[in-house]
């Protein structure tokens, strides 16, 4: 166990809560102390839902530990069933309650209810949130479909109907899942493919029973749905797709794979380059500015892998770092990083990720909410591509990541920080020209240039002071800092570190303009 300020994933019962809250007519009884009820805020504050999660907490206290906590659990289970009348009941325990070993799932099954009861055994001290969500979804599907017949059914061609697919994996607190589902439904409809069930998002236990009516399962989020898709293929003979449609190339590959599995002819429109604005821009002269930009990528496995492909193949970026916090996806991320000449960063320590960002000196960071803060401290543009996220990454507007429109959104989210960074750098370069003299009139009208000079100096001073000066460190002179401020902000930190290292090696106590250029010549030699 380690003490940390931030964590990429919560304990596995948070993953179970995500599944329960995503579904309808389902209730989750969680054996947990009062302090574990904080999880409600994740859905009401970040996801901005208008209702509480369908979760009943036993909320035991210290004084209850001296009595029969099993009776406390049974009382809450009965109250939840009588009050909410769910079609199925999930029963589990939090990391704290796991230590008591009351086994609430076994207690619930012995109470004689006539609804399916899914007992969740989630090892809180060895697994995390995404695994908990995956295991919960798997147990729900397995429990409800375990008695389903394995007899082969007629194909969609024999039944003379349109092909049907299930979209599996989207959940609440997933990255743009709501909009991804709408985009993929729209995309499949254009090719004559119907959606049978979307699960767990918006599905009820009755919908889970309809999963076998589909011809193919589409695994949209492997972290949540892959184990379920594998079980459905083995036990119910329902094949599933493995390509996640994130980006133009991946969307094309996804459609080709799906058509092949369904034994449909692949239409020529799949390969048309005008499906997304990203392709048009990548072929335009304006995109030359972006070619070769250094990008660092970190997030959940699905989005990190997709981002690496988009950056490398579709936007012409140079990927200088690739990693994930999801150990379940590490097996897929490592070969992808190796193909780019990198060593994958597999860690759940955000400070280790920040150190890797410093070391690689990227011009753009694609990561989570944590990397946004790290990039801000380092003065590097950043776009959030993965959970964990904050409320600003759950837009009220339609903003998918998958499909053609998702590629457009990705293009905007990634390119705009770089373009605004260019504008900031140009202003920094030419701020001494007569058009930028502080006394001149500005767009602020009567305020003119008052206060601009001090603000600019403070901003430069803040950007420059990104390391703590110790007794052995060389000191920057005013001329040296002034010259350093002319260097683009996205490489300024690297130049500063290299110059300081050179000054230490050369025995310089002060870094002036001449030292800066000597260091430049030294590292270029």
Swiss-Prot record:
Binding, [4Fe-4S] cluster: 36
Signal sequence extent: none
GO biological process, one term: light-independent chlorophyll biosynthetic process
Pfam families: Oxidored_nitro (PF00148), PCP_red (PF08369)
Annotated catalytic residues: 286 (proton donor)
Keywords: 4Fe-4S, ATP-binding, Chlorophyll biosynthesis, Iron, Iron-sulfur, Metal-binding, Nucleotide-binding, Oxidoreductase, Photosynthesis
EC number, as in UniProt: 1.3.7.7
InterPro entries: ChlB/BchB/BchZ (IPR050152), LI-POR_suB-like_C (IPR013580), Nase/OxRdtase_comp1 (IPR000510), P-CP_red_C (IPR042298), Protochl_reductB (IPR005969), Protochlorophyllide_Rdtase (IPR016209)
Cofactor(s) this protein cannot do without: [4Fe-4S] cluster
Note on cofactor: Binds 1 [4Fe-4S] cluster per heterodimer. The cluster is bound at the heterodimer interface by residues from both subunits.
Enzymatic reactions: chlorophyllide a + oxidized 2[4Fe-4S]-[ferredoxin] + 2 ADP + 2 phosphate = protochlorophyllide a + reduced 2[4Fe-4S]-[ferredoxin] + 2 ATP + 2 H2O
Annotated binding of substrate, by residue: 421-422
Gene Ontology terms for molecular function: 4 iron, 4 sulfur cluster binding; ATP binding; metal ion binding; oxidoreductase activity, acting on iron-sulfur proteins as donors; oxidoreductase activity, acting on the CH-CH group of donors, iron-sulfur protein as acceptor
Enzyme class: oxidoreductase
Pathway where it operates: Porphyrin-containing compound metabolism; chlorophyll biosynthesis (light-independent)
Domain of life of the organism encoding this protein: Bacteria
Database matches in PANTHER family: LIGHT-INDEPENDENT PROTOCHLOROPHYLLIDE REDUCTASE SUBUNIT B
Subunit text: Protochlorophyllide reductase is composed of three subunits; ChlL, ChlN and ChlB. Forms a heterotetramer of two ChlB and two ChlN subunits.
Protein name per UniProt: Light-independent protochlorophyllide reductase subunit B
């Amino acid at each position: 166990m380690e003490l940390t300020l931030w964590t990429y994933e919560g304990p596995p019962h948070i993953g179970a809560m995500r599944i329960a809250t995503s579904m309808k007519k389902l209730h989750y009884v969680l054996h947990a102390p009062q302090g574990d009820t904080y999880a409600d805020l994740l859905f009401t504050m970040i996801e901005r839902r208008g209702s509480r999660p369908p979760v009943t907490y036993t909320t035991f206290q210290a004084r209850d530990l001296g009595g029969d906590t099993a009776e406390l659990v049974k009382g809450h289970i009965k109250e939840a069933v009588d009050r909410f009348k769910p079609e199925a009941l999930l029963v589990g325990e939090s990391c704290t309650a796991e230590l008591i070993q009351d086994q609430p799932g076994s207690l619930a099954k012995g109470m004689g209810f006539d609804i399916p009861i899914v007992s969740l055994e989630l090892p809180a001290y060895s697994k995390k949130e995404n695994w908990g969500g995956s295991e919960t979804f798997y147990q729900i599907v397995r429990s409800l479909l375990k008695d389903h017949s394995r007899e082969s059914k007629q194909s969609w061609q024999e039944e003379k109907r349109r092909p049907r697919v299930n979209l599996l994996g989207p959940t609440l607190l997933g990255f743009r899942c709501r909009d991804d589902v709408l985009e993929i439904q729209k995309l499949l409809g254009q090719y004559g493919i119907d959606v049978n069930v979307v699960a767990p998002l918006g599905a009820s236990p009755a919908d889970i029973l309809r999963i076998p009516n589909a011809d193919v399962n589409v695994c949209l989020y492997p972290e949540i749905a892959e184990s379920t898709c594998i079980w459905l293929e083995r036990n119910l003979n329902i094949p599933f797709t493995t390509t996640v449609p994130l980006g133009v190339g991946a969307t094309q590959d996804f459609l080709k794979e799906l058509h092949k599995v369904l034994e449909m002819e692949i239409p020529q429109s799949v390969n048309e380059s005008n499906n997304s604005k990203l392709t048009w821009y990548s072929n335009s002269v304006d995109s030359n500015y972006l070619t070769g930009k250094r990008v660092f990528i970190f997030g959940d496995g699905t989005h990190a892998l997709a981002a690496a492909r988009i950056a490398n193949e579709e936007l012409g970026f140079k990927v200088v770092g690739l990693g994930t916090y999801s150990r379940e996806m590490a097996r897929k991320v490592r070969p992808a990083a190796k193909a780019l000449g990198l060593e994958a960063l597999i860690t759940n320590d955000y400070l280790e990720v920040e150190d890797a960002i410093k070391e690689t000196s990227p011009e753009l960071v694609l990561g989570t909410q944590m990397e946004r803060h790290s990039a801000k401290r380092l003065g590097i543009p950043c776009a959030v591509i993965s959970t964990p996220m904050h409320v600003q990454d759950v837009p009220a507007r339609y903003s998918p990541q998958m499909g053609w429109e998702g590629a457009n959104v990705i293009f905007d989210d990634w390119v705009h920080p770089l373009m605004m960074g260019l504008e900031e750098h140009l202003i920094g370069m030419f701020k001494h020209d007569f058009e930028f003299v502080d006394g001149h009139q500005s767009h602020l009208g009567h305020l003119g240039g008052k206060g601009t000079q001090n603000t600019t100096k403070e901003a430069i001073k803040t950007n420059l002071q990104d390391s703590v000066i110790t007794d052995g460190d060389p000191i920057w002179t005013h001329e040296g800092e002034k010259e350093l401020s002319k260097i683009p902000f996205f490489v300024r930190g690297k130049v500063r570190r290299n110059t300081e290292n050179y000054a230490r090696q050369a025995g310089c106590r002060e870094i002036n303009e001449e030292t800066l250029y000597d260091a430049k010549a030294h590292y270029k030699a």
